[in-house]
Amino acid sequence: MMAHRTYILVIALLTVLSTHAQLGRYNADIRALPQDFCDTITIEWERDQIYVPVSTGGRSYRFLFDTGASQAVVFSGSPLANAPRVSSLLSHDAAGNTDTVSVVGLPPLLLGHTTLHNCHATVQPRGVGARNIDGILGFDLVNSGLSLKLDIQSKRLIISDRECCFDREEAATSLRYRLFYHVPYVDIIPFGRRRERVLFDTGSRNFFSMTLDHFNVAEEKRHRFYRPYRVEGRTIGQHAIGHGGTEPMGEVVFLRLDSLGLGKCSFSQVHAITTQGGSHLGARLLRYGTVAFCPVHSRLFFQPYEGLTTCVNNRQLDIAFISDMMGRPQVGLVWPEGTPYRQGFRQGDIIEQIDGRPVLSLIQFVTWPFERGREYSFTVRSTDGRRHEIKWIRVPQ
């Protein structure tokens, strides 16, 4: 088979999206010292994710900053998971799975020059997407009254206990956010006059994903001669991976939006997919401007780096991998119009070997030392048990 180029993306939404029903009281009483402060922390921005340095007990840790997490998360087996247990709660993950999880009281955390006291964290199993982090910082930082600003261009996080610290800064858009299960939702215009309430979720690498049911309602009401989006394909698959497992199989619609509105700002040529979970605006928004939170007035401020109108023109997701029942990498979703589909990849295919070397787990697959520009041979077993070879040259996402 001729060598082709393709894009591979593993969707591993490690966000604990919300705390739907709680057995213990939600903690929004993080105390920051010293008082009356404004601190700047240098952050890492890697593959559309925000990583912050945290230290405690003489050790340094790497935490993901995730506004889609209602509070901090630490992983089973980590020293931090041995902190005193304070309660339990019922947690819902990104794939819609529910589980009762333990909540521990973390020791004081040093973030920049600021010490955070009374942080609570849920204890979760370490998923595929969490292999390179020690924990998650959630939106309880803001819910506890701390103002916060993210500036990816300058690679900095600014945090302050001063009331509405960023209110007087110039911002093109000021939106009221509403808390549902302790995480922030804002209203956007994905197309036409459609108003959609979305989770602003920095734990997601996507720019935008829309609830399938909401899209189907909008599709039924569309004007027969005007549609401010293009359906680029439909298929059956699954792509979201949460702490409790993978989302159920379902229909996925591939979209290209003419213009997505965020307050006074608009984003054109946005590729997106539907999801069985809630609609969300992901961390990729931060490529295009700063985001600040003022908890006193529940405001989100967005200031674009350039003009009010931005052409996103992001790549369409053409293939996503999940884990099968035995932990092996499996094609969860493949775009019918994409290169991987033309190569022969199909939903349900299991990756057994790469260049003759066995692939035993999804974690092994996503950490494979691929070299840019090199052709690889995949041994794939389809759902009917047949094996075949697919050659491709990996193009980084």
Residue ranges and their predicted role:
Residues 1-25:
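Bacterial Sec-dependent N-terminal signal peptides
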Residues 21-397:
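Pepsin/retropepsin-fold aspartyl endopeptidases
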